[in-house]
Amino acid sequence: MAINIRKTHPLLKIMNHALVDLPAPSNISLWWNFGSLLGLCLIIQILTGLFLAMHYTADISMAFSSVVHICRDVNYGWLIRNIHANGASLFFICVYLHIARGLYYGSYLYKETWNIGVILLFLLMATAFVGYVLPWGQMSFWGATVITNLLSAFPYIGDMLVQWIWGGFSVDNATLTRFFAFHFLLPFLILALTIIHLLFLHETGSNNPLGINSDADKISFHPYFSYKDLLGFFVMIFFLAVFALFMPNLLGDAENFIPANPLVTPPHIKPEWYFLFAYAILRSIPNKLGGVLALLFSIFILMLVPLLHTSKQRSTIFRPMTQIFFWLLVANSIILTWIGGQPVEQPFIMVGQIASISYFSLFLIIMPLTSWWENKILSLN
């Protein structure tokens, strides 16, 4: 009998257990495609970023011009830049859908996998933030100034911390250089953590829509889910191509086509769309330190979700009341995203404050209480 090298070779054996002979639940739906889509996004971002870094100059006198040079003079530089910029948006769409899937089907009960996922989200946000500063446009400069300034809210060490990150007394050349270094380094850290994320996932196996043990009904990942993922790849690449080729600047800010000028403040300073929900929460609290803590907690609250799970069932598929509140949370997050892009005036301030209170209430109070109430109803039968 011929030896199957896929199953015996020390390196290929690891790949085989992760991608070919991996036992997967037979009933996982399209919502389980986003993990592999995120892997594809990461590879696209690293490759396009690598080619952009070859032509980019991390110096405040040349950064903006070097981006213009990439778009005008480098072969397909405009395409690489458009794919990289819109790929980031697509990355965040996939991340948010991946998290929503985890919340809906109770995947957060794999605590190690979930917590590493939250750390990955935080690193992804950090990478996107420092990357947005690199073109050195108006919104790049003022976004960096406003967001880094938030650290000054921390008592005693705040001002020192801000100047340490800036590398001086304002956002300047030292800031841009270190942000470029971080933007180059962090994706590789994300890649390493992704492997650990997968390692913990394969310890327990994938969850499934019913939220029950699927050991009795597993099928191999290849060819069933490898082809299913391939369909997702083509759909995502199609949307990425549509955005990169037909509307590359739709999700960006027009203000960033103006070179950075420390003497002129843009009328509305706002981050990219994928940060707007957290930015709205930050702005809804009048106290600076309170706002910063709420901003951090809006992401790290995800780490509390496994501890706040009070239901006897894992998935929300058989819990209609929890489903209603889950979709309320989705709608609430969309409202926060909209509010984050609006000017700081009434009625947006009030709507933002109500949406921020609702966001935390749904996670901390409403959903755990609803699950407890559903348990009571089930025990009556």
UniProtKB/Swiss-Prot annotation:
- Identify the GO cellular component terms for this protein: mitochondrial inner membrane; respiratory chain complex III
What is the cofactor note? Binds 2 heme b groups non-covalently.
The miscellaneous annotation reads: Heme 1 (or BL or b562) is low-potential and absorbs at about 562 nm, and heme 2 (or BH or b566) is high-potential and absorbs at about 566 nm.
This protein's cofactor list reads: heme b
Question: What's this protein's family per the entry?
Answer: Belongs to the cytochrome b family.
- Please give the name of this protein: Cytochrome b
PANTHER family recorded for this chain?
CYTOCHROME B
Q: Where in the cell is it found?
A: Mitochondrion inner membrane
Task: Identify its membrane topology class.
Answer: Multi-pass membrane protein
Q: Which domain of life is it from?
A: Eukaryota
Q: Where does heme b b562 bind?
A: H84, H183
Q: Which gene encodes it?
A: mt-cyb
